[in-house]
A protein has these predicted regions:
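Hydrophobic, ordered structural segments
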Residues: 86-140
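An N-terminus-focused feature that recognizes amino-terminal "leader" regions
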Residues: 5-98
């Protein structure tokens, strides 16, 4: 699977006038993600790119950004990656590189109630710089 990203622009004309000003002042740009099927077979004309946005499957890795391990040294589950250069720009977010999400492969899928503040080794969110994208591969 890969992701198609679009900017959502809600129609506020149907919202009562007394609320429109508050909604307009507090509006933030967001990106809507829509899953679309794409073959991952090598050589397929419409095959997914290793650095493309995806949910599940194989993660893109490099020598400097190998597959992450949990606090016990076990491989983590790859959830998703977003190619930021192909996203519409959002204020305060990087515009290039590969944003990846991983969780621990355990009974609670990385959730540790006593360590919710982070730093537990049960999940990883990382940004692979654009300069690394030309020298990587899909994890095996």
């Amino acid at each position: 699977m890969v992701l198609v990203m679009t900017i959502m622009q809600p129609d506020i004309t149907k919202i009562p006038a007394q609320y429109r000003d508050v909604l307009t002042r507090n509006a933030r740009r967001v990106v809507a993600l829509q899953l679309t099927g794409v073959p991952e077979k090598k050589g397929a004309a419409d095959a997914a790119e290793p650095t493309g946005s995806r949910v599940g499957g194989l993660a893109f890795v490099t020598d400097d950004y190998p597959e992450p391990r949990d606090s016990d040294g076990n491989r983590m589950i790859f959830l998703a990656q977003l190619n930021l250069a192909k996203l519409p720009p959002l204020e305060g977010y990087p515009t290039e590189g590969l944003l990846q999400f991983f969780i621990a492969d355990d009974d609670l899928l990385g959730l540790e109630y006593n360590k919710l503040a982070g730093g537990s080794g049960s999940f990883v969110v990382r940004l692979i710089p654009a300069s690394e994208l030309g020298r990587g591969r899909l994890a095996e």
